[in-house]
Amino acid sequence: RGLGDVYKRQENELFKKFDVKRGLRNEDGTGVLVGLTKIGNVVGYERIPGGGLKPIPGKLFYRGYDLEDLAHAILKEKRFGFEEVAYLLLSGRLPDREELASFRELINDNMPLEQKTKMNIIELEGNNIMNILARSVLEMYRFDPNADDTSRDNLMRQSIDLISKFPTIIAYAFNMLRHATHGRSLHIRHPQENLSLAENFLYMLKKDYTELDARTLDLLLVLQAEHGGGNNSTFTVRVTSSTGTDTYSAIAAGIGSLKGPLHGGANIQVTDMFHHLQENIRDWTNVDEIDTYFTRMLNNCLLYTSPSPRDGL
């Protein structure tokens, strides 16, 4: 233990001496500039004249639109908003009614999987959905006649195809693992034309779901749709794609990064959090008690020095 402390101290001294960036962060806590984008922007502090940083309430912008404004509009109008936000992020502008209807139809048309991919998910050995997702994404390369084309139009087509198929892959993988691990009946449901992406995901996952389930999932998808490209998995995709490799290889690399327990893999602890929540909330009718609990638990995002804009939503 003593020797480990010495190594740790020496490492810290060397990192400081040579200005090694830990976690893509400068010593003052600001992010390392690795690229420029107008797609997503994270704001968590403001610079003080003369030096230093001042924490401010976190803000997240999609193509210049405040995420909170987008989310509140979706909630107020009681509609499903993920497809609209995906269109905004991909194209740079919000769709009109006809464009949104066409985009939703395009998403639904691309949700079904190739029969070979479907069977491979069922037959794959393993107990981790993220690994199955990465392998399934790599397999999509086989069925794409223009897999290595990195032109803008083709990248757009591939992106829409991936957005469409992710819910199907994940739902099928979950049901397969539940069947293989817990002996549950295996149900493979086809996506429905009249459902939103969030509704289709829940339908394929468990068929019986409430409208609250679907609207909550839709909101979560909106909140997680983009994060500026500076976290580990999106940075991994940036590095991988900079070599000119195909889209599927780059996205699979990002999934591998996201799986890590120090990044998206931390989501596996959500189940534990629910148990913790049940043990620590005494009155489920007390909104203030529930709000205090979630504020305390969620106010720990490294990208924000004050509460994340996602917390309140």
What are the roles of these predicted feature ranges?
Residues 121, 125-228:
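Glycine-rich, mobile lid/loop segments that gate access to catalytic sites or pores
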Residues 32-58, 203-233:
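Active-site-proximal helix-loop elements at catalytic-domain edges
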Residues 91, 109, 261, 272-283:
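Short, well-ordered loop/turn and helix-capping segments at boundaries between secondary-structure elements
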Residues 87-94, 244-272:
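Conserved phosphate/anionic-ligand binding catalytic regions in large, soluble enzymes, centered on
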Residues 67-83, 215-218, 230-257:
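Short, hydrophobic/aliphatic alpha-helical segments
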Residues 10-118:
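An N-terminal structural lobe/cap that precedes and organizes the functional/catalytic core
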Residues 1-7, 304-313:
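Single conserved hydrophobic/aromatic residue that forms the stacking wall/gate
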Residues 284-306:
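A structural-propensity feature for long, helix-poor, extended segments
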